[in-house]
Amino acid sequence: MAKPSAKKVKNRRKVRRTVAGALALTIGLSGAGILATAITPDAQVATAQRDDQALISEGKDLYDVACITCHGVNLQGVEDRGPSLVGVGEGAVYFQVHSGRMPILRNEAQAERKAPRYTEAQTLAIAAYVAANGGGPGLVYNEDGTLAMEELRGENYDGQITSADVARGGDLFRLNCASCHNFTGRGGALSSGKYAPNLDAANEQEIYQAMLTGPQNMPKFSDRQLSADEKKDIIAFIKSTKETPSPGGYSLGSLGPVAEGLFMWVFGILVLVAAAMWIGSRS
């Protein structure tokens, strides 16, 4: 059998090299395409990232106007003015700003609740900026991305507060909260001009974040001390005491027979004294 000529062998090798090169190029381009697809965010994610950056930028602008004097350029705090905000998280900012306690009017024993200066959207922007510079406890959101409110009314909330959640929440509230806020969340006096506020005006997210972050004189309740579901049950109890109707009229702080008995005793004594004085003046 005749051996192929050197020219034919050379041509075959050239064809093989060409085919191998084309195959390698195809594999390389395909791999690069797959890798690019894997690491490049889709349009939805990229849009979300841009939205987050826009929110943080808006929050920084608001911070520079309202907060920088007391909390510093880098959120590090200013001596005798305001504490560091590094690591406090979205939750603490939402509670303080949304409840109107911040910006504070003047330094005193305790910041009072007042009408908020900023809208909820602006509050969330400031919270996003602070969280972007140190992290910390976050807000609670629903699956659709909206801020959780009524959804925090108990572990088993389904549009209505359940009696089981209220019962558990009541036990937890009396154990952990009643010593300061009294048995129905109406507040009470503390030492050195401080006080535990009435909880009627607080929304569900504010109450949740107050338990989580421990603002001002309040202790922190981490998820190890009170789980997320236990916090929700406490909120269910607080909201149930506010919204429970009072068939007898004015609830007298919802303190029960002690307050009602005291009122009737004082009122009755006054009526008797007035009647005695009237009888005396007629004789």
UniProtKB/Swiss-Prot annotation:
Q: Reply yes or no: does the keyword 4Fe-4S apply.
A: no
Q: Which UniProt keywords apply?
A: Cell membrane, Electron transport, Heme, Iron, Membrane, Metal-binding, Repeat, Respiratory chain, Translocase, Transmembrane, Transmembrane helix, Transport
Q: What happens when the gene is disrupted?
A: Cells lacking qcrCAB show strongly impaired growth in glucose minimal medium, which indicates that the bc1-aa3 pathway is the main route of respiration under these conditions.
Q: Which reaction does it catalyse?
A: a quinol + 2 Fe(III)-[cytochrome c](out) = a quinone + 2 Fe(II)-[cytochrome c](out) + 2 H(+)(out)
The compartments listed are: Cell membrane
Q: What is its main location?
A: membrane
User: Residue limits of the Cytochrome c domain?
Assistant: 54-134, 164-242
Choose one Gene Ontology CC annotation of this protein and give it: plasma membrane
How is it placed in the membrane, per its record?
Answer: Multi-pass membrane protein
Which superkingdom, per the lineage? Bacteria
Q: How does it assemble?
A: The cytochrome bc1 complex is composed of a cytochrome b (QcrB), the Rieske iron-sulfur protein (QcrA) and a diheme cytochrome c (QcrC) subunit. The bc1 complex forms a supercomplex with cytochrome c oxidase (cytochrome aa3).
State what protein this is by name: Cytochrome bc1 complex cytochrome c subunit
Name of the gene this protein is made from: qcrC
